[in-house]
Amino acid sequence: MTATRNVKGLLGTKLGMTQVWDENNKLIPVTVVQADSNVITQLRNAEVDGYVAVQIGYGQIDPRKVTKPLAGHFEKAGVTPRRHVVELRTADAASYELGQELSVEIFEAGQKIDVVGTSKGKGFAGVMKRHGFHGVGASHGAHKNHRKPGSIGGASTPSRVFKGLKMAGRMGAERHTTLNLTVHAIDAEKSLLLIKGAVPGARGQVVLVRTAVKGA
């Protein structure tokens, strides 16, 4: 599948949330993402790979902890080893160069973006917390069933539990994408992106900031 649109993206570290005043004296909640040391580590093309994309490396890592195949991969690109890599399919991949550094200035204030991250892990959670079940009545015959899911299926028909039924289980720690967020401001000197609203993940989590897929 060939990319038909230009997509820009950066890997960064979520530093946390704060609030800033806008020009209308309105308090805006923002998430601060630091996106420094992004570099192009590989270029994909349709002739060799069957699709066009750029591979971006981010984050420092001790060279002694890098496997030899990966060390050779980074050496071929002429860059120091990076801890995280991600591929972005974009139609203008040929306009990039190996070893090219990317800064937060590829985005601009007011631009719509998507942020991909790993949601906070909540551990084993019940159906009320995990799926928003209302639970069972607090009285009138309910006996130690207040937070239970209730019936999970029929007896003789269908005499089984359907796949995908909402039950208790591990919650969170999953890849999550928040669409159509807005870049509130950019600090190029400190490589910071101020993104209006919340983004997935905990403080210190690596997130991918990219051009909005839906382009709203």
Curated annotation (Swiss-Prot):
Keyword terms of this UniProt record: Ribonucleoprotein, Ribosomal protein, RNA-binding, rRNA-binding
Keyword Aminoacyl-tRNA synthetase: no
Gene Ontology CC: one annotated term: cytosolic large ribosomal subunit
MF terms in GO: rRNA binding; structural constituent of ribosome
Region of interest called Disordered, as start-end residue ranges on this chain: 137-157
InterPro entries: Ribosomal_uL3, Ribosomal_uL3_bac/org-type, Ribosomal_uL3_CS, Transl_B-barrel_sf
Database matches in Gene3D superfamilies: 3.30.160.810, Translation factors
Domain of life: Bacteria
Function: One of the primary rRNA binding proteins, it binds directly near the 3'-end of the 23S rRNA, where it nucleates assembly of the 50S subunit.
Protein name per its UniProtKB record: Large ribosomal subunit protein uL3
Organism taxonomic ancestry: Bacteria, Bacillati, Actinomycetota, Actinomycetes, Micrococcales
Gene name as annotated: rplC
